[in-house]
């Protein structure tokens, strides 16, 4: 769990990144604070913190890293570094632990961040977003003066009659001709909402990152045929022999239905937004040590769907219902700048969930007055054995930070040193890393 403090203007300075949990200190400002702190602690300490451990493979002794670079990275492969080049000068590297400093010092590497864990974030307020009005074309010629009756059949009409009435409306925004890309936990491709009236799949591509296989529409159609040949027309095992990708959490299927379900599974009653669109789905990979995917996998997924949409010459809406609350929230992290840059590639829009942390009290911010002290309390549960705190400020501002334990002991003032600082208070170990302004 993370709790974060502070939110300011662009060109913020991450003055400290603290973690409870904490070998070599590296002060290179081409790396983010959290990565520097992760590299400077012992492996035992790293294992006690989810945020510090994310991206490190203990068996291979490698780090997964996000880089912003220029030029050519092909020479890194000769040193045993795995390179995945993304669009617009972004890349994902799998670097042996002993080569991280070497990679950092390369002139073509502009900045490095470590991956972060992602969590579910989805909004389901279809009606509150006025989508019914958009789909129906309010103000047009309808078979019934009440638009809701055309959707839900309050007039007793059939689904066919309701669809015929909608076809007369001037707006008629159904998603036809558009691609919807769902980057999530996968999809139940056997669900009728993701099939055309003739029983073929609406999914053009399904990339299962866990298997690193891209399944085509033809393969999914073959799986659907095998499914229908079973007893009672439902042989899931036969289908999974052909396309063995499943959405175990159901989150991706629900998101896909909200965005693009055509309502066939409910006789047209529960229909999504772009119900005549076609889909591309990426099932984000889940490392064995974690329950959720990482930002690196999200970036690879966005790169894949945008490249594919451009090859097909189609507009695409990319839905991201995973996220996290890490960082300064000013749009300058490598993930955020990557998504900003990607909006100019081809014809696309990228949509991100607003999160589920509205009542979590995980952030605070405001203005400090000259010469005055402000106290901010952190609530830590009895069973919470590690958490992280970030403080961000504008570059020109100067202030000091100290910590007060539950017993009243004062720790600090924290020093402005570009290195790991270690403190101990009662049974709590505190690690701090002070950082200077960076380009990202």
Cite the ranges covered by each PLM segment.
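Short, well-ordered alpha-helical packing segments
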Residues: 104, 135, 152, 163-166, ...
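Autoinhibitory N-terminal propeptides
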Residues: 1-91, 98-169
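Surface-exposed acidic, glycine/proline-enriched linker/cap segments
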Residues: 132-161, 214-244, 429-440
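Substrate-binding/access-modulating region of protease and related hydrolase catalytic domains
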Residues: 286-368, 372, 383-410, 419-440
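Short alpha-helical segments and helix-capping/turn motifs at coil-helix boundaries
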Residues: 95-98, 135-152, 159-169, 178, ...
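Subtilisin-like serine protease catalytic core
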Residues: 167-296, 313-317, 347, 385, ...
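Short strand-edge motifs at loop-to-beta-strand transitions and within beta-strands
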Residues: 91, 374-376
């Amino acid at each position: 769990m993370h709790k974060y403090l502070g939110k300011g203007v662009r060109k913020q300075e991450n003055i400290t990144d603290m973690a409870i949990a904490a070998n070599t200190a590296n002060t290179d400002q081409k790396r983010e604070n959290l990565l520097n702190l992760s590299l400077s602690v012992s492996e035992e300490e790293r294992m006690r913190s989810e945020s510090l451990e994310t991206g490190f493979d203990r068996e291979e002794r490698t780090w997964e890293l996000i880089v912003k670079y220029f030029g050519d990275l092909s020479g890194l492969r000769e040193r045993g570094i795995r390179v995945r080049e993304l669009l617009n000068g972004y890349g994902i590297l799998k670097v042996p632990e002993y080569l991280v400093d070497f990679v950092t010092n390369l002139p073509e590497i502009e900045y490095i961040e470590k991956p972060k864990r992602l969590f579910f974030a989805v909004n389901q307020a279809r009606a509150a977003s006025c989508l019914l009005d958009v789909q129906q074309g309010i103000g047009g010629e309808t078979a019934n003066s009440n638009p809701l009756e055309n959707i839900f059949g309050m007039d007793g009409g059939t689904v066919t009659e309701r669809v015929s009435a909608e076809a007369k409306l001037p707006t008629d925004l159904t998603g036809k001709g558009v691609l919807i890309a769902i980057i999530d936990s996968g999809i139940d491709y056997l669900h009728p909402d993701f099939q055309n009236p003739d029983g073929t799949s609406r999914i053009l591509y399904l990339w299962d990152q866990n298997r690193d296989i891209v399944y085509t529409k033809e393969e999914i159609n073959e799986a659907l045929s095998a499914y229908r040949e079973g007893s009672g027309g439902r042989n899931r095992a036969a289908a999974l022999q052909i396309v063995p990708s499943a959405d175990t959490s159901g989150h991706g299927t629900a998101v896909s239905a909200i965005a693009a379900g055509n309502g066939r599974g409910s006789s047209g009653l529960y229909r999504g937004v772009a119900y005549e669109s076609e889909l591309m789905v990426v099932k984000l990979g889940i490392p064995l040590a974690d329950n959720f995917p990482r930002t690196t996998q999200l970036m690879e997924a966005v790169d894949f769907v945008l490249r594919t949409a451009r090859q097909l010459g189609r507009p695409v809406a990319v839905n991201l219902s995973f996220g996290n609350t890490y960082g300064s929230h000013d749009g300058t992290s490598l993930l955020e700048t990557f998504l900003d840059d990607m909006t100019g590639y081809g014809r696309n829009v990228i949509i991100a969930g607003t999160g589920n942390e509205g009542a979590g009290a995980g952030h605070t911010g405001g203005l400090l007055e000259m010469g005055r002290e402000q106290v901010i309390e952190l609530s830590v549960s009895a069973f919470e054995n590690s958490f992280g705190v970030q403080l961000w400020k504008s570059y020109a501002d100067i202030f000091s930070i100290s910590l007060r334990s539950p017993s009243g002991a004062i720790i600090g003032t924290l020093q402005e040193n570009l290195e790991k600082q270690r403190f101990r208070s009662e049974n709590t170990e505190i690690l701090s890393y002070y950082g200077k302004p960076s380009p990202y």
